[in-house]
């Protein structure tokens, strides 16, 4: 399911929850749900949430710069080792370019940069003595880019961990309903989103790798896009009905 659809569903689910549980709707709750509704896709390097942390154009530029710097370094080191033999050093550098471009690709670099960003954020929080649950939360997110797409981050266990960490932060900092709306947003990604795609999600990972699916259409296909619209329409209808009923 597309990122914008996940975001929309997360926001609508939050509005519905606010109506059902008679909780005032706030911008904070909606933004929180929107962010958490796309968090599971941090395990996909080109997802909406990954692009929030690091734009693809930026990572492609960084990749070029890194490769150029390494190649220049290899060339000059080779010159020194080979007694300023320009021809031999050029051959060594050319081979190095071929190997580097094969081994260091855009996706790998994005994973590294995304993880480093979240790890650095965790370290900053640790050194300014923010409560450990914040640090653990961002360290967990730092592991997501290295996970197989739709594995741990798309499981019930991940929802439980997210709820637990947010609940501790909520209690410590007295942030009303943080765990409730964060978990709703995250869970909506799974149960109102990817569960309805053909590839499904491993709900009981890591206990079982079996993927569960209530859909028959590939993400991005006409029918899957139509299904996404239908889910959004149903949620909007549910909100209107709940409002009228109240």
Q: What residue ranges belong to the model's regions?
A:
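N-terminal membrane-targeting hydrophobic helices
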Residues: 1-188, 192-246
């Amino acid at each position: 399911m597309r990122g914008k659809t996940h975001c929309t569903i997360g926001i609508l689910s939050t509005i519905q929850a606010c109506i059902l549980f008679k909780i005032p709707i706030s911008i904070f709750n909606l933004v929180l749900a929107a962010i958490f509704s796309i968090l599971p896709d941090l395990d996909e390097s080109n997802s909406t949430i990954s692009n929030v942390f690091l734009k693809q154009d930026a990572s492609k530029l960084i990749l070029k710069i890194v490769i150029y710097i390494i190649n220049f370094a290899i060339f000059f080191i080779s010159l020194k080792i080979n007694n300023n033999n320009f021809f031999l050093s050029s051959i060594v550098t050319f081979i190095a370019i071929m190997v580097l471009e094969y081994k260091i690709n855009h996706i790998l670099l994005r994973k590294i940069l995304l993880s480093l960003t979240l790890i650095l954020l965790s370290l900053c929080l640790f050194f300014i003595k923010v409560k450990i649950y914040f640090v653990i939360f961002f360290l967990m997110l730092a592991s997501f880019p290295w996970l197989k797409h739709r594995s741990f981050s798309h499981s019930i266990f991940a929802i439980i961990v997210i709820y637990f960490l947010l609940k501790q932060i909520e209690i410590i900092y007295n942030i009303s309903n943080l765990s409730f709306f964060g978990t709703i947003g995250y869970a909506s990604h799974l149960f109102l989103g990817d569960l309805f795609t053909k590839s499904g999600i491993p709900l009981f990972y890591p206990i079982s790798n079996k993927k569960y699916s209530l859909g028959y259409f590939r993400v991005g296909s006409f029918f899957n896009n139509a299904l996404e619209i239908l889910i959004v329409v149903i949620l909007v209808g549910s909100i209107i009905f709940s409002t009228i009923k109240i």
